[in-house]
């Protein structure tokens, strides 16, 4: 991620947009509560400031949730979304950088604040939204659901850890320059944050909050995406590559050269394939591990303009297309597109509630 630059004119416009009034509601209240009691995908529509709900049994949009803050204003430019289940409760965490990141991670402004939104995934009610000192990339629950982790995207990089019940700040962790996505390994033993200006990944012990390793990767890493088999896949925007990290040893196992700017990387264990979105060309490329940390490209799937996030549910993969305002449903076995689902404007993050 390149250094954030000042742009006073844009900041003024965004300040006006943030002030646009709408129907007021308080934290924990919803204009009309939903009853999403079925397996669903939740898609964040950045420009629309909504969540599209896709019923997985029919692959159709069955509901739309407006994102409103406690003062009754639209929550502008939500980004990524994560789910946590505790017993029968399902909650969603949404990171809100407050600006359009669909073209890349440049253009932020000093003084820009971020936000975290916590939502009940069944009713659609916003449980809490709270402002952050600096813009963030995402917000994610800790593996046990007791904490919410989020980054601060500036040169004095930090990860903030909040209590998921009281929403009070518990810990501030110093990481590299301009951290972006915060993620956890599949086994929950380590947290990762990609430092775009440092070209590193910070590895954090979730219990002690100590940085236990700093891993050098390629240019402008954005997210370290978890996979089964003890690996993390890091998408490096500027070097147009994927770095493969070993969770146990913290070693950088090697680099997959893509020759396109990656938007997201997701590993499908059943097919033993790594899917990487190619936003520029509206495709997803898929790679197979040939052994010895050697990955070979096996094909491409045409999805839609500005392909971005990828998520798997059984036999199907789901890809958000920011430029097409759709979600593509892909048959994992045949790599054939099943359908395109129209959603809101500039869809970005996607997550499942099963």
State the predicted function of each range.
Residues 24-354:
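Predominantly soluble domains enriched in secretory-pathway, periplasmic, or organellar proteins
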